[in-house]
């Protein structure tokens, strides 16, 4: 439930912070929320639960890989893309992440795709294409770049989700989350420095959004996602893709007056329909085993 409700609102918070009037460079905003979030988690791990902070080298290796994919490429990519596209639009593109997970798992496991799987992918990917129809027609270069970054972020998140599920089972979700955000945050800080992002000059609203992202986005929701991946089947965890875009589109329209067009609604419907079809296909295969 935390993943459903909180993550849908983080797209709005990111947009408020990184838009021109917000004052936060996108990579600095993403990096700082990850670093502060990891610090809070490490304090909780040490002071309340009394756990050691050291990890085995193999475990740390997979945390480094997933941290860079999830937080640096995933969260950082969304933050950067939201300087070019609206919060609701970004959430809709990221809502197609379960399609990426399904494609990657089908390739890795060498499964022969069913007719339902193929049709669902075509519908879902068609929805993403329809969402970008106006930008392509109008040759909106900024939005097209934003979409490309979001697709890469989605692919990174999907890849990390699969690695997390297959290589990090049985370990502490809170410890995993802390290290992933620390490593991803450091990666973003290095990238921000290399790209020469300016010193932040955030507005009050941007600071409030940043605080929300640290506490609710990084400490609570991100950690809940890591925990859910260990406790639940992947296709159940990924059902957040049904809810997050709806919440994000509504909040973007309500707070920032982001435009919701017939293209938006039609494309969003196809994406969600495609995701539902993929989940039904995966659920049916699981039940037959």
Where in this protein do the model-derived segments appear?
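Cytoplasmic-side transmembrane-helix entry/capping segments in multi-pass membrane proteins
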Residues: 58-65, 113-124, 171-180
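Specific transmembrane alpha-helical segments of multi-pass solute transporters/efflux pumps
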Residues: 6, 10-11, 42-94, 130, ...
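Helix-helix packing/entry segments at the starts of transmembrane helices
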Residues: 32, 71, 75, 89-96, ...
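Hydrophobic transmembrane alpha-helices of multi-pass small-molecule transport proteins
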Residues: 41, 45, 96, 113-134, ...
């Amino acid at each position: 439930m935390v993943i459903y409700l909180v993550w849908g609102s983080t797209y709005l918070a990111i947009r408020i912070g990184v838009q021109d009037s917000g004052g936060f460079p996108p990579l600095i905003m993403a990096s700082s929320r990850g670093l502060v979030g990891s610090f809070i988690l490490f304090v909780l791990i040490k002071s309340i639960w009394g756990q050691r902070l050291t990890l085995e080298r193999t475990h740390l290796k997979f945390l480094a890989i997933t941290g860079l994919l999830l937080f640096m490429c995933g969260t950082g990519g969304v933050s950067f893309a939201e300087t070019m596209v609206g919060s609701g639009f970004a959430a809709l593109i990221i809502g197609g992440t379960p399609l990426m997970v399904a494609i990657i798992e089908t390739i890795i496991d060498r499964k022969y795709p069913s007719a339902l799987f193929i049709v669902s992918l075509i519908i879902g990917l068609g929805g993403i294409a329809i969402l970008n129809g106006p930008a392509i027609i109008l040759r909106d270069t900024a939005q097209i770049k934003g979409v490309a970054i979001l697709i890469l972020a989605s692919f990174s998140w999907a890849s990390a989700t699969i690695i997390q599920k297959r290589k990090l089972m049985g370990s502490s979700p809170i410890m995993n989350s802390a290290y992933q955000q620390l490593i991803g945050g450091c990666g973003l800080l290095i990238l921000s420095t290399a790209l020469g992002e300016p010193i932040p000059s955030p507005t009050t609203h941007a600071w409030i959004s940043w605080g929300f992202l640290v506490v609710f986005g990084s400490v609570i929701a991100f950690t809940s996602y890591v925990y859910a991946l260990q406790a639940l089947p992947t296709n159940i965890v990924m059902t957040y893709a049904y809810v997050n875009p709806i919440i994000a589109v509504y909040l973007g329209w309500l707070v920032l007056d982001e435009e919701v067009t017939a293209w938006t609604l039609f494309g969003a419907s196809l994406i969600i329909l495609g995701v539902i079809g993929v989940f039904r296909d995966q659920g049916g295969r699981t039940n037959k085993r």
